[in-house]
């Protein structure tokens, strides 16, 4: 049976549930789809359908993730939920599921737990811009003062990791009651409040085409009589014929002019996000451009060698290393289209990193790469992936 045509009339936003094990992330996910389906149509998903998340591979890493979708009056949401803590770590670091905002689920009966903290830290490190809190299992807490205390703890924890704890929407409810069809304050009403918080607190994300032009260089050709053509897929923004662009990374940044855009052997007057194009550059020699650099709107992105990152190290079963690595480990860092060697500095309290761990590191590359916070990369040894990471903070 053919699926109904996907009507992309409402703006699209990506979200996901995060939080400690057994605090009710999957139950909440099921409750949201159930309650919103009644109101706005769509497809309700039962707990078991979400819990039996299929395996997927992102950059060679196995991750279990459930994807559901739902609609509110104003938006269409794609929502990810992971069964295990390790899946969250991998998901957030690889960016397999980019989140425009996260729903932090915290049990009112238990308060913040170790993974509550770890997921907030991860969200900060990988650049999840907004967090909304669902204080779950409120039906199990009779004491209003206790609820207030838990809410305060969660706000403090958010503030500690540079989220605006005092201004974060916190919805109190019970995912279980909502899922069972309870129409009270803690049931369906709470889910509708959460939907409203999603709609109002998380801004509509900028579309890729509205960003500053950026295209990773995949290949460079010299065409006699025309000049140098650089091919790749436009990651964001638009490039128009006649515009000035910069070549950034590996070598000192240089300015050039786009004198032509080709797609499928046809000449266009512009290339935009998602297009695989060839860009003709005026006065640029073939040897001035190489794979691993980017073409970008002047001043929009800068090259860097020194940064902190959050990384996940593949386990042996995932084809990763069989042994730990230590301070000053020197693998290759694969950014966009090329490998650059770099050295890793571990946190003071970490002597070594075991396969299957995630860790915050500081990296120094031997050549600069066009970089911004939130950029994903792979860690490789002789061409095989041994880790995945995301730039947390640029140092220089």
Curated annotation (Swiss-Prot):
Catalytic reaction list: GTP + H2O = GDP + phosphate + H(+)
- Region span, G2: 60-64
Q: Name the NCBIfam families on file.
A: EF-Tu (TIGR00485), PRK00049.1 (NF000766), PRK12735.1 (NF009372), PRK12736.1 (NF009373), small_GTP (TIGR00231)
Where does the protein end up? Cytoplasm
What's the Enzyme Commission number for this chain?
3.6.5.3
Q: Which UniProt keywords apply?
A: Cytoplasm, Elongation factor, GTP-binding, Hydrolase, Magnesium, Metal-binding, Nucleotide-binding, Protein biosynthesis
The record's Gene3D superfamilies line, in alphabetical order, gives: P-loop containing nucleotide triphosphate hydrolases, Translation factors
Chain ranges of the tr-type G domain: 10-206
Q: Where is this region: G1?
A: 19-26
Q: What is the originating organism of this protein?
A: Burkholderia cenocepacia (strain HI2424)
Q: What is the lineage of its organism?
A: Bacteria, Pseudomonadati, Pseudomonadota, Betaproteobacteria, Burkholderiales
Functionally, this protein is described as follows: GTP hydrolase that promotes the GTP-dependent binding of aminoacyl-tRNA to the A-site of ribosomes during protein biosynthesis.
Positions binding GTP in this chain are 19-26, 81-85, 136-139
Spell out the residue ranges making up region: G5: 174-176
Quote the subunit structure annotation: Monomer.
Q: What is its main location?
A: cytoplasm
Q: List every stretch annotated G4.
A: 136-139
This protein's GO cellular component annotations are:
cytosol
Q: Where is this region: G3?
A: 81-84
| Protein family membership | Belongs to the TRAFAC class translation factor GTPase superfamily. Classic translation factor GTPase family. EF-Tu/EF-1A subfamily.
Which InterPro entries does the protein's record reference?
A: EF-Tu_GTP-bd, EF-Tu_GTPase, EFTu-like_2, EFTU_2, G_TR_CS, P-loop_NTPase, Small_GTP-bd, T_Tr_GTP-bd_dom
Q: Where does Mg(2+) bind?
A: 26
Q: Name one GO molecular function term.
A: guanosine tetraphosphate binding
- What this protein is called in its record is Elongation factor Tu
